[in-house]
Structures are given as C-alpha cells and as structure tokens.
C-alpha cells in the first residue's frame, strides 16, 4: 500500500518543458499563474444621451487597446444576451491587488460614466494565455 501511495505522489516530468517560455509567461510549476477575471455588467446610467454613450463606448474600446499594449489586459470581449445583464469579460495579468485593478478599471470611460459596472474575481489559469495576443492582431479584417 505504501508503494502505491508513493507512486501516485510522484510528479511526472514534462518532456516538452521550455524553461525560457515558463519564465517569460511567469508560469508556476504547473504552467499556471494568477489573474483577475472581471465580469462587466450593465451599469446604473440609463441616460438616453447618445453622444455621451458613444463617447463612453469609444473610450472603453480605446482603453482596452491601451491596456493590451501595456501588457495588463489579456482577454477582452462581449458576452451574448443573458438574464444577468452581464455584458463582457476582462482577464488581467500582472496586477498586484484588487485595489490596483479597481484604479485601472476607473480609467474606462464606460465604467466612469456608469454605463458599465463590474465584478472582480481572482482566477488561476494557464500562464500561456497571453501567447494568443500576437496572433489575434493578425486575423481581424475590421477594427471595432
């Protein structure tokens, strides 16, 4: 019985392990790292001011671009219509605390103008997630 237990506890080495990639993406021993998952939801601003709404949404998209370029935002995208009024998600990397994340979120015009609100959750996922970003900029035909 003791031998079976020690075999089950043995870690299997990855023959494809690349230390430089693991370091580049700040992976732990399991190829994972901590992120913040932000769920964007409909905010309290019900204004019909189309100019303010358009300006806020343009600022929202510009802010997404800036945060991606700064290496903080890894994933951003809208959600389909749902009963919880969830509008989209963000996944952030390299942000030290929820307080610092909330300061970053406060730079988003749609959040600042209360068209969007948010919920924040710590998330543990693949450290390779940011690796898709260079490809994503090469496959779109129309800029949002």
Please tell me what each predicted stretch does.
Residues 3-5:
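N-terminal signal peptide c-region/cleavage motif recognized by signal peptidases
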Residues 9-144:
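Conserved, structured core segments of small domains
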């Amino acid at each position: 019985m003791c031998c079976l237990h020690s075999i089950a506890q043995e870690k299997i080495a990855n023959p494809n392990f690349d230390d430089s990639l693991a370091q580049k993406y700040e992976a732990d021993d399991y190829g994972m790292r901590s992120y913040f998952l932000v769920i964007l939801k409909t905010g309290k601003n019900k204004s019909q001011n189309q100019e303010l709404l358009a300006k806020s949404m343009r600022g929202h998209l510009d802010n997404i671009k800036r945060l991606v370029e700064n290496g903080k935002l890894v994933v951003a995208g809208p959600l389909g219509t749902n009963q919880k009024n969830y509008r989209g998600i963000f996944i952030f990397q390299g942000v030290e605390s929820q307080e610092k994340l909330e300061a970053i979120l406060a730079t988003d015009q749609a959040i600042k103008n209360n068209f969007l609100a948010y919920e924040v959750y710590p998330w543990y996922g693949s450290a390779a997630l940011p690796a898709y970003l260079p490809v994503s900029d090469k496959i779109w035909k129309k800029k949002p």
